[in-house]
UniProtKB/Swiss-Prot annotation:
Catalyzes the 2-thiolation of uridine at the wobble position (U34) of tRNA, leading to the formation of s(2)U34. It comes from Kocuria rhizophila (strain ATCC 9341 / DSM 348 / NBRC 103217 / DC2201). It catalyses: S-sulfanyl-L-cysteinyl-[protein] + uridine(34) in tRNA + AH2 + ATP = 2-thiouridine(34) in tRNA + L-cysteinyl-[protein] + A + AMP + diphosphate + H(+). The active site is at C101 (nucleophile), C199 (cysteine persulfide intermediate). Its EC number is 2.8.1.13. HAMAP family: tRNA_thiouridyl_MnmA. One of its GO terms (cellular component) is cytoplasm. This is tRNA-specific 2-thiouridylase MnmA.
Length: 383
């Protein structure tokens, strides 16, 4: 097959490209230039998308003896990821830009261009697994190394995208083995530190970055009764579950800390309260999609614009490296608009609108939806 290897400049994508070559594919390396100003970004452990990363990717491609190109996707990245990130925070939601990048850039714009140029598949260094299901369709599963598993951020992939995705690190037992293999292959990125932060906020200061990219007006911090407790420095820069940085002078009557419970962008208010009020057991999601074929309970709905599926058992994850929680899920449609509902067996805390919930059955990723509402439907203690 003709395979386009997305090379970020890190060790994972370099080893993935090398394994694609070993598998006998005709491999071409490509580095995506996502930043309009890569020279201003930090290099090293906390950044990516820098000029240094592009050079590291080129060195790896040269070592592997494969063609290498740099494609400028900065305008699309700005519109689909960065601008979306700002818009979501402005609306009081907490987005996941890495998932949006996979959805709109790596497995949409990149894959579209790759197929148009005659490539058969895109190869990346993600820790995830694509397998053929019993019905012959491709399925997305967790990687062998659950500590590094990235199936959560790939939950946005569609059935068609899975048909053209290759993840050579799927069965790798540990990151240490990837680094050892890179060392054996003579790849200079073998000891390069991982990047952990949002790539366009390499110093990790999300609040500071938002202050530079949107209007953050001071407003009231209130309790659930509407009593004013203090003043915030921009409601959109807070997130549900946050405890630090509230600057509330008046202590709670019980002396316990307060947490952000809700962001109200229309009134520019931040609502705070005790930890137990963070606990939720129901989540509702918009824009659901399925990684491969939908569950049979959903498929049974057909094209009915007003319907409710049967419930099906799942585990659900709301953070990239969060613990999967047992739950039951079902899909409803109202005037043709789908909405995913999840009822957790045990209450969870700190779930914010804008986050993504990814559904699993065993190791298989079923699909995902953007959380639109999260609330407590039955009494329970804080978790």
């Amino acid at each position: 097959m003709r395979v386009l290897a997305a090379m970020s400049g890190g060790v994972d994508s370099a080893v993935a490209a090398a394994r694609a070559v070993d598998a006998g594919h005709e491999v071409t390396g490509v580095h995506l230039a996502l930043s309009r100003t890569p020279g201003t970004l930090r290099t090293g452990a906390r950044g990516c998308c820098t000029i240094e990363d592009s050079r590291d990717a080129w060195r790896a491609a040269e070592k592997l003896g494969i063609p290498y190109y740099v494609w400028d996707f900065s305008e699309r990245f700005q519109a689909d990821v960065v601008d979306d990130f700002v818009a979501e925070y402005a609306a009081g939601r907490t987005p996941n830009p890495c998932m949006r990048c996979n959805e709109k850039i790596k497995f949409a714009a990149l894959l579209e261009k790759a197929l148009a140029l005659g490539f058969d598949a895109v190869c990346t260094g993600h820790y995830a697994k694509v397998v053929e299901g019993p019905d012959g369709h491709k399925e997305l599963h967790r990687a062998a190394d659950w500590a590094k598993d990235q199936s959560y951020v790939l939950g946005v992939l569609t059935a068609e995208q899975l048909e053209h995705a290759i993840f050579p690190l799927a069965e790798t037992p540990s990151k240490a083995q990837v680094r050892a293999e890179a060392e054996e292959r003579g790849l200079s990125v073998a000891t390069k530190p991982d990047s952990h932060d949002i790539c366009f906020i390499p110093d990790g200061d999300t609040r500071g970055w938002l202050a530079d990219h949107m209007d953050l007006d001071p407003g009231r911090i209130v309790d659930t009764e509407g009593n004013e407790l203090g003043e915030h420095r921009g409601a959109q820069a807070y997130t549900v579950g946050q405890r630090r940085g509230l600057h509330i002078g008046r202590p709670a009557p019980d002396g316990k800390p307060r947490f952000v419970l809700e962001i109200r962008p229309k009134t520019n208010e931040v609502v705070v309260g005790p930890e137990q009020l963070l606990a939720i057991d129901v989540m509702e999601g918009i824009r659901p999609s399925w990684a491969g074929l939908p569950p049979r309970e959903v498929a049974a709905l057909g094209a009915d614009p007003k319907a409710r599926s049967e419930e099906f058992e799942v585990t659900v994850q709301v953070r990239a490296h969060g613990d999967p929680a047992p739950a039951r899920a079902w899909l409803t449609r109202s005037e043709g608009t789908p909405r995913l509902h999840v009822r957790l067996d045990t209450a969870q805390r700190g779930v914010a609108p804008g986050q993504t919930m990814v559904l699993y059955q065993g190791t298989r990723v079923l699909g995902q939806a953007t959380i639109d509402a999260a609330f407590a439907d039955r009494p329970h203690a804080a978790v």
